[in-house]
Amino acid sequence: MSEPAAIGGKEREQILDGTAALDEFVRRAGYPSIEAAVAHHTVFLDPATVTQTGGGALFPVIRNAARRGIVDVVDGREVMHCDNTTPTLAFLWAADRSNGPDIQFNHVWSRSSDPDCYTALWNLCCTPAFVAKTSDTHGTIVELLRYRSYDLYGHRPLGVAAPTPPVGYQSLEWAAMPPPATDLEQRLRLRMLSAPKARPTIAARTIGWLYSQGPDTHLR
């Protein structure tokens, strides 16, 4: 928790400016800007993979770490509460990749209580942990990632205006994408069948998921 700059009327010097430190770090590494560094290390899924979802979220899940694993009715919809396990696995399974050290899976739009966004593949990206904080707190990075997602997939949360291209966007080089899934539904089914106790599998089996009408009995 941050301490106010002035307590008892006394101004105190900031112990560290993290934004300035990151800016210096990326420039010393040879990047022209923080935006260029983040782009170079941010992985999005191939549009050919995401297109197979039709813009829908994969699983009826929302974030509530304290109630993770519990099925509930929220705003008239049956959902499962989760920490970030389900969106993380959704991204990794869709990419056909395993997790790596010191990385973070980020929501492009912070809609953790919206089941239409929380596990939507167009709303997810992966970054090294050392730049992940910028996806939440650095305004230009937030705008950059939102436009990147919209540019790739054409989706955005309901009621949100279409983002506009940031200055210099066309000159950025982005991290390579995993090869596209030939059949995303089949890929995900195979992963769930091999992980029957994983939270996405339980949600799909109990409530349903994007590719089922109600609880998916094929996952029992």
Feature roles, as predicted:
Residues 1-82, 143, 148-155, 187-217:
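Nuclease and nuclease-like effector domains acting on nucleic acids or nucleotide cofactors
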Residues 70-100:
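Short N-terminal edge-element motif at the start of the domain
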Residues 91-126, 130-139:
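Histidine-centered nuclease catalytic patch
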Residues 117-119, 134-174:
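Polybasic, low-complexity binding patches
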